[in-house]
Structure formats: C-alpha cells, structure tokens
Amino acid sequence: MKLSKKYTFRSRKVLLIILDGVGYSPKGPESGNAIAGAKLPFLNRVWNQFPTLHIQAHGKAVGMPSDDDMGNSEVGHNVLGSGRIFDQGAKLVSNSIASGDIFNGQAWKEVIGNSKKNNSTLHLLGLFSDGNVHSHIDHTKALISQAILEKVPKIRLHILLDGRDVPEKSALDYLNPFETWLNSLRKSGTDIRIASGGGRMTITMDRYEADWSMVERGWKVHVKGEGRYFSSAKEAIETFRSENPKIIDQYLPSFVISDNGKPVGKIQDGDSVVFTNFRGDRAIEISLAFTEKNFDKFDRGPLPNVLYAGIMQYDGDLKLPERFLVAPPAIDRTLGEYMASSNIPQYALSETQKYGHVTYFWNGNKSGYFDQNSEEYREILSDVIPFDQSPEMKALLITEALEKALNENKQDFYRVNYANGDMVGHTGNYLATVQAMEFLDGCVERLWKTCEKQNIVLLVTADHGNADEMFQLDKKGNVEKDSHGNPIPKTSHTLNPVPISILDPENKIRFNSKLSNPGLANVAATILDVMGYETPEGYHPSLIQNES
C-alpha cells in the first residue's frame, strides 16, 4: 500500500456502515417504499444535507449476467471488498452450460460415471426458481437434459421452494410447467421424479450456523425419506396452503413424495448428488453434512456412501466441496488483504445473518483472517425467529459494540453490516420493515456522534435494495393487488441503486458528482482515498473529488 501524495487533508480513519437491503427509490410509501414510509430524522438529514450519491448495485455493475438481475449481499460484498467487478456464479454457470465446458469437466464425468457404474440414482438438490440469486431453474434443467443424453438410469429431484428472491407465493408457477416437462421425459422412458422438498427457510438452506435444525430437517426428507408423505409436490404445496392460507413459500414445511407408502427418492449408497445452488453461504452446511467425516451437528444416521458435488465450490479455503462443476470467481487483491499486508488495523462486525458478508464475502470468498494480529472480527448471534417478529434484530448490541470499539480507537478501518433492511424486508412485512428502518435511524445517529468525537470519517451505503420496494409492481409501476384489494407483498431484492453518503467531522471531503456510472466497485478506492492511500492497480476509481 502506497501513501498518496495528492492530498493534504487525508490520512483519516474510516467507518463504513452497510445498511443491508436499503436501496434508493423516488417512489413513496404508497408504492411499498418502507424507507419513505419510515420516520428517519437522521438518515433523511444525511441523504439530503451531506454529500450523497446514488450508485449501481445490481446487474452488470456487480458481475451478474444482465441488468435485469438483482444484486444480492454476496456479490455486493464481493464488489465492495475487492474494488472491481468479477463475473459471478450465475453468469459463470450460465456461460459454462452454453459453452458445454461444464459437461466436459472431470467433476461432471465422475458424477455421471458413478451413477452409470453403480446403476444408481442421480440426485439434484437446490433452490427451485429463476431468482438467479442462489440458483436458476434453467441450470437444473440443463443438468437433467445432459444426464438423460448420457443415459443416467434414474434421476430424483429435491426442490427447495423460494418465495424470497421471487414472488412469495409463486411455487406452483414454477412447479406446474416443470412437472409437465418431467411428464414428457417420463413418456420418453426417463425415470425422473421429484422426491422431496420444502421451503428454503424451513429446511436445508441455513447459513453461518444460525440454525442447524434446518439442515437436519432437510437431511431427513432428502436422504432418509422421513417426513409427511404426499403423492406429488403440488399436492404438498396445496395442502400446506389450505391448512395455513397465510403461509408463504419460503416457510412451507418439508415433504416427501411417496408411492405405495414408500419414499420415491431416498439418497442411498452408490448414488450421485449435485447441489445446484451456485451461491455459497446457504450451500456450505448441507455440503458439510454430506462430506464431513467427523460431523457432529446432528445425527445423520447411517451415512450413505455417495459421490457429492456442488455446481460450484462454496469455500475455496475449506475446499468445500472438493468436487465441483464450475470454478468460482477468482477474487484476489481485496481491500482486506491489502490492509492486512500493510499492517493497517481493521475491525469487522455484524450479527450472524450478515457476519459472513463483512468477513468471508468481503475478503473475496476466503475464510478466516489474512493477519489475525491486525484484524478483529466480531459476531453477535442472531435470534432464530422470523425477523418481522423482532425488526430491531441485534442492531442495538451491534451499535453498542461498535461504539466501544470506536472509542477505544485501536483500528484505522471499521466496517459493519446492519441486516435489518434486508432480513426483515425478506419477510414481506411492510410495517415491520418500517419499524426496522426507524430503529436503524437512531443507531446510525449514535455512531455518527461517536465518529465526530473521534474524528473518524463515516461512509453510509448499502449492498443492494429490498426495503425500498415492498409491494409487487406491474410493468407500469403500479402496485399489484390481491383479490381482497390488498397490495401483494414483495420479498425479493430490487434493481434500484443504493445511496452512499460521506460524513466528515472536518467537513472537507466531497464526492465527484461527474464520475460516470458509479457503483459499489468504487467504494474500496474511496475508503483508501480518505485514509490517504493510492488506489491499487485495476480498482475502480475513488468517488472523492480531488482537491483543486
């Protein structure tokens, strides 16, 4: 890291606050903008009176295939922490399928070869939608089509219902045409069926070890075939909805498809299993359950001897899983790595739901520390409840811990993620999201007062939108309503930009408003600029206006 010679007032300490899921929309609360609907005396003052820009946080600006693709916390923190844009999992897998490279790779050959050699089942397990945040249904269909071409004897599908990155009750919109397609494959002689499933926030897709019981519930239905039996996934979904009309897809209970009283697709010795999610955070725990010899998170029972692969590798440091179909993005020279190599003290803090984002994803999908002597990571455990029941989440404890760290003044760079806007936003509960935002307003104000006292520059931004659009909108931007005239909740991320504001106790630093198409990739250089360091080669430029 080289000190910059351009500026006289730099060499400042920095706090970066990431308000997860807090995008910018000019629309009002009547359109589902929970940020506009909240009373935010401090944040509104920040956005209106302090230097503020709106920067891109979706689509190609964060490495997604197109500008129709939402941003998400994983890619957002990758870009924030690396200062550059890398092709992300969605694009890498799509490109590999289009080129055929995925099917010419060693891992795919081993997956198919194992099933053919043992005359066994190929199991495909993953999120079942086209949300393109964790997975895409087209990837699953491509794997199925290729497996049939290569004459795999039997295919079983274990579907995790979304309703989070897509409309909250859209499961049958994906399932019905998919089952029609499967039926045509069966008529052509393919032994293929859905075997199990459930909502993504009920089974299998836990992250950051927040709730291993989710993974255990998934294990029971996918592997053991233990659970409530149904003749089809459609019957399961319709039954659960009739029993609880308010339930949304992500919280649907687990189910097992049976035939004559027996599960149609238990995972057994000799089978091949591919996890079809490309995003890592919610893929790691189920991958450990399939591959870890000394596993102690729950009783797996007799562990089936299977050949397991991920569509991508989910943790490069842990080599998890060892077998993967597409290589993940190779993110190097991150801001955290540069700072650690120069012995610049860093502090990272969040609650469990976003802790991995300010560490693992920020550091380019790398676990652990670069240099434990100069880095301090702090996790505050999240509650295991639906977050609209407690919209403040752990924001108060985070604020108190960060105030303490700022007052101790041991580090030069601090980063924190407040999960509320995203995690409460994902519940689709507009009023709870308003409450979450109002609680955050006071937290950010407290931190600014501490920064003023310690002469620390404060940057406030977000990784993507969510709370800014809580109702489904039609193509004309009008709110879509249900049969009772109520707005249809939206639980997914948005395509909106995010604000970034700079609060300088010395009131010297200004943004360069003439910079073309700024995005999250500009934030890393901005941090270094304020701290008095030159921008590393290849990084997107700083947002700071040069001194005249």
Curated annotation (Swiss-Prot):
What quaternary structure, including any partners, is listed in this protein's UniProt entry?
Monomer.
* Task of the protein: Catalyzes the interconversion of 2-phosphoglycerate and 3-phosphoglycerate.
Q: Where are the transmembrane segments?
A: none
Q: Which reaction does it catalyse?
A: (2R)-2-phosphoglycerate = (2R)-3-phosphoglycerate
The superkingdom of the source organism is Bacteria
The entry's free-text remark on the cofactor is:
Binds 2 manganese ions per subunit.
Query: Which cofactors, if any, are listed as required?
Result: Mn(2+)
Q: Which GO terms describe its biological process?
A: glucose catabolic process; glycolytic process
Q: What NCBIfam families is this protein classified in?
A: pgm_bpd_ind
Q: Which residues take part in binding Mn(2+) 1?
A: 422, 426, 493
Q: Which residues constitute the catalytic centre? A: 73 (phosphoserine intermediate)
Q: Which residues bind Mn(2+) 2?
A: 20, 73, 463-464
Organism equals Leptospira interrogans serogroup Icterohaemorrhagiae serovar copenhageni (strain Fiocruz L1-130)
Please give one Pfam family short name: iPGM_N
Q: Manganese as a keyword?
A: yes
The protein, known as = Probable 2,3-bisphosphoglycerate-independent phosphoglycerate mutase
Binding annotation for substrate:
134, 164-165, 200, 207, 279-282, 354
Example GO molecular function: phosphoglycerate mutase activity
Enzyme category, top tier: isomerase
Q: Which family does it belong to?
A: Belongs to the BPG-independent phosphoglycerate mutase family.
Organism phylogeny: Bacteria, Pseudomonadati, Spirochaetota, Spirochaetia, Leptospirales
This protein's GO CC annotations: cytoplasm
**InterPro entries in the record, alphabetically?**
Alkaline_phosphatase_core_sf, BPG-indep_PGM_N, Metalloenzyme, PGAM_B_sf, Pgm_bpd_ind
